[in-house]
Amino acid sequence: DPEWHTLDAHEVEQVQATWKAVSHDEVEILYTVFKAHPDIMAKFPKFAGKDLEAIKDTADFAVHASRIIGFFGEYVTLLGSSGNQAAIRTLLHDLGVFHKTRGITKAQFGEFRETMTAYLKGHNKWNADISHSWDDAFDKAFSVIFEVLES
């Protein structure tokens, strides 16, 4: 599995530090993703066809944002230990299965990645080294998720 590797300590530190800076921005992150990619929002039965501006400040939106972005935070937290690799793989596999049943595409995961990276860049000091660390973190996650989507 060429993409499956344990990030080194430096990469983990960078990913976790930059994540920490935005980890409580759940609503804003999900809003940013939906605003940039209405096709992703359309996959959420609770939100499909609704006005994003009207739902952004609702409890339903906050709960969903907390779940989605919280999952991502769990992944980032688990990155720090080689003993967590099986748990990470299981978490990502289950995410892939869930999203496959909802018809989520690799392209939509790519859109999420693009928007999340832009959000992270906008809320952190950013450089090529941090960018590389996040690329590795996304590649690791997507290697498992895409394996499921393609099965």
From Swiss-Prot:
A molecular function (GO) term: oxygen binding
InterPro entries attached to this UniProt entry: Erythrocruorin, Globin, Globin-like_sf, Globin/Proto, Mb-like_M
Chain ranges passing through the membrane: none
Globin domain: residues covered: 6-150
Coiled coil (residue ranges): none
Recorded superkingdom: Eukaryota
One Pfam family in the UniProt entry: Globin
Alphabetically ordered keywords of this record: Heme, Iron, Metal-binding, Oxygen transport, Transport
Ligand binding (heme b): H64, H99
GO cellular component: extracellular region; hemoglobin complex
Keyword tRNA-binding: no
Miscellaneous field: There are at least 12 different components in Midge globin.
Subunit structure: Homodimer.
Family: Belongs to the globin family.
Name of the protein described by the UniProt record: Globin CTT-X
Organism: Chironomus thummi thummi
